[in-house]
Amino acid sequence: RARVIHSLCTCSQLHFSEETKQVLRLSLTEFSLPKFYLLFGISKVKSAAVIAFRSSYRDRSFSPGSYERETFALTSLETVTEALLEIMEACMRDIPTCKWLDQWTELAQKFAFQYNPSLQPRALVVFGCISKRVSHGQIKQIIRILSKGLESCLKGPDNYNSQVLIEATVIALTKLQPLLNKDSPMHKALFWVAMAVLELDEVNLYSAGTALLEQNLHTLDSLRVFNDKSPEEVFMEIRRPLEWHCKQMDHFVGLNFNSNFNFALVGPGP
């Protein structure tokens, strides 16, 4: 990534403003710091030169890693993607006909909705981070992927990949909800998606589930959904078509939203 930024800084065919060049120089410095190596899973590196001349195939492990390592990779991917997006948008301001972001988004969407245990989770996260618009249908597709991940998680034995896929869909939904049309019924339904993830009682998914719940409440509050109705009234109303499924989840974790909404809301957790 640092080499790509360096190429942009030195390319004579691209003419950037001083402001853009400053963004590129600062980004190049930041990407050369040890903290950014860690985001790529690279540790114990003393300088940029060390990693530049290290063989990309040396010390590569093909054994399955722990889920903690994969969780780190997905959350790190958010940071890296947002940093690259900032660089791309700075460059695009000086290139009016530039289609870089459109092409990136198109590729991310293609792999996000295509089954591939290695690429799909990462593509979902990237798609969520870089998208500038989202449709009701795309959100439904992501929820279907989440549903398939849940089914695989319950059936096993590939619990590891299933949890990674679940986390990726939740991260994508968290990023995309603010882009949804304000009249979309998905806004309220995503509350129960977040609660379902939390009710799984998987410590590795708790952070992602909590982030989706927080984003959901902030978004609904900004849309003034709670001006005339309490959160309990809003969410229990949208729950009715899903009552049979929701009750099964509630029974599994020993909660009851019908009898005590507030207590049940704070109940799920690791």
From Swiss-Prot:
It comes from Gallus gallus (Chicken). GO terms for cellular component: nucleolus. Stimulates the GTPase activity of Ras. NF1 shows greater affinity for Ras GAP, but lower specific activity. May be a regulator of Ras activity. It comes from the Eukaryota. Keywords: GTPase activation, Nucleus. GO terms for molecular function: GTPase activator activity. One of its GO terms (biological process) is negative regulation of fibroblast proliferation. This is Neurofibromin. Transmembrane segments: none annotated. It is found in: Nucleus; Nucleus, Nucleolus.
